Amino acid sequence: MSENKLFCAIVFLTSLFCSTCSQGTRFVHSAALDAERRYNIKWGFDESTITFEIEVETRGYVGFGLSPTGAMSSSDIVIGGVLNGSPYLLDYFTDSNRKVHRDPLQNYELLYGRENDTHTVLAFSRNLQTCDDNDKIITGSTVRVIWAFHAEDVGESGLVYHGMNRGRKSLRLLNPGTGPSIPAGTAFFDLQNKEVPVPHKDTTYWCQIFRFPEMKKKHHVIRIEPLIQKGHENLVHHILLYQCDSNLNKSEVNRGHECYHPNMPDSFLTCETVLFAWAIGGEGFTYPPHVGMSIGTSIDPVYVQLEIHFDNPSLQGGIVDSSGLRLYYSPSLRRYDAGVIETGVWVSLYHMLPPGMTDYITEGHCTQECLQESLDSEMPSGVHVFAVLLHAHLAGRAITARHFRQQLELQPLASDDQFDFNFQEFQPLSQERLILPGDSLITECRYNTKGRMNMTWGGLSTREEMCLSFLLYYPRVNLAKCESLPEIAGQLKFIGVTEIQEPVTTWPFVIKSPKKYSNLSFTEAMDKYKWTMKKGKSFNDIVRKLPMNVRCSKTGQDEWSIQGMIVSPPEVRSEQTSTAVVACRKDSAIQCEHSLALLLTACLLLILQTCLHL
């Protein structure tokens, strides 16, 4: 009989343990949502569910939400706390007027909650796709997380306004890009501003040229991370590191200037290829164990430009900043040298977006002709992409780096349907992707120009636009840019231009006829045209089918022979293999799950009761 009791106890405890473990989640990712680290989150996920643990410096309520824009309106919110020793959690949403409503469908499940003298901790989970119109679907794209807290719990009278205890942070919850650690004591050098005076305005982009340290032999950079001056965590919004022309004048080194200013030195314009990108809240980028960025050889970067975006909405004066980047490097060489290929739309005034458009699509082609010639010559077996940076400016809303082989579309290299200009980092790929000679790539960008009165032009300023994907790959080949640009003639024909003044002696060039555009530059003519959303849509459809000019350039000023060729956009077909969000389930299926759980619980209790009577 004692053996039967022991057997029953083992069965019961094993069943209980298994049912408990199935609900457990390992929090492998974490982030501080504010600069003072008062609000911290951890999370983990599987193919259908995400689980959060939040720790906040308060004994009152805490709010956590997912927003389409980073603002309060139209957000998916959960509010909870610990009141009189009992944790609570409620699912809310806000309407377009920011009014808070309790969600009829409570899709967030409270797992546990506790508090001490200073902090509140809550853990909760939800499905990635809840099938609730008031909840946001969580995907691999950028997620704008909003947060708030208050010193008091939610009482009978409802929520108390949180005041200034609030904020937002963009994260990639399903693609956080956790990298491997590097050995302690790894050597490093810093690229750091020296007491730069931050102007008395809300937004400033500061550029400075640096020279990499001279190396007697080849080394590999294995990690790059931000150096943010203490107290400036909310001031320094993002940092970009560009490779410059290796023939840059040495007198430019350590010279700083406001970026994109009319008086910015021309030499700064040679710094185009992004080597690294960091955005507020990020923790840097670590190269895979078999790859590093080569420095110290004749073909490696020598001069670089550091671009820092200062965000000063309160217009504080008298600020000086010494932020920058730290690059860790090692003489222990890895198997492969990393390279960067810039793909997308060639930055030019020929890239133009009509005003007033809620969804305008631009496509930049890295053509099969360019990849065929360059990779056949340098690496016939292809190159492996391990990280991607998707890049646009303020009008950008979504970007996808599409991949084709023999005109058949494969899975995208990277995609972000909720692009945030202020959150740009290299996204490590979960699996490396092979690019073969003859493959082709399309960087597809979606823009919103609603509220703009004139054309938006391709250019360097943040009010101008870009559509680029920077691919980190190995082994390095001599291919720096693989881009395209739609021909201008077809774009001008749309607004009725029939002739330009020749010879062309000015830029932008001047229109000759018809009379209504005579002696206007082509940019002035485009602005003069009476755009409507319908006309903008027709223009978009035409531009995407126009012949395009191919850019296929090597490092420096050299070019592959394909550069300048005029080709038509390829006819491609989709394989329909894109990863879909978790499908909504019928209520009956959910009820069945609950019934099964209740049945399992009843069985366990029956086993226990039987054991007690043996």
Swiss-Prot record:
Intrachain disulfide bonds: 207-259, 244-271, 366-482, 370-552, 445-467
Active-site residues per Swiss-Prot or TrEMBL entry: 205, 391
Main location, first listed in the record: endoplasmic reticulum
Topology with respect to the bilayer: Single-pass type I membrane protein
Domain DOMON: from-to ranges: 37-150
GO molecular function list: copper ion binding; dopamine beta-monooxygenase activity
Residues reported in the UniProt entry to bind Cu cation A: 237-238, 309
Example of a GO biological process term: octopamine biosynthetic process
Transmembrane regions: 594-612
Enzyme Commission number, as recorded: 1.14.17.-
Signal peptide coordinates: 1-22
SUPFAM superfamilies (UniProt xref): PHM/PNGase F
Residues given in the record as Cu cation B binding sites: 391, 393, 466
Keyword field contains Membrane: yes
Keywords linked to the UniProt accession: Copper, Disulfide bond, Endoplasmic reticulum, Glycoprotein, Membrane, Metal-binding, Monooxygenase, Oxidoreductase, Signal, Transmembrane, Transmembrane helix
Glycosylation sites recorded in the entry for this protein: 116, 249, 454, 519
GO cellular component: endoplasmic reticulum membrane; extracellular space; secretory granule membrane
Domain of life: Eukaryota
Lumenal side: 23-593
Cofactor binding summary note: Binds 2 copper ions per subunit.
Enzyme class, broadest EC rank: oxidoreductase
PANTHER family attached to this UniProt entry: DBH-LIKE MONOOXYGENASE PROTEIN 1 HOMOLOG, DOPAMINE BETA HYDROXYLASE RELATED
Record-given protein name: DBH-like monooxygenase protein 1 homolog
Species of the source: Danio rerio
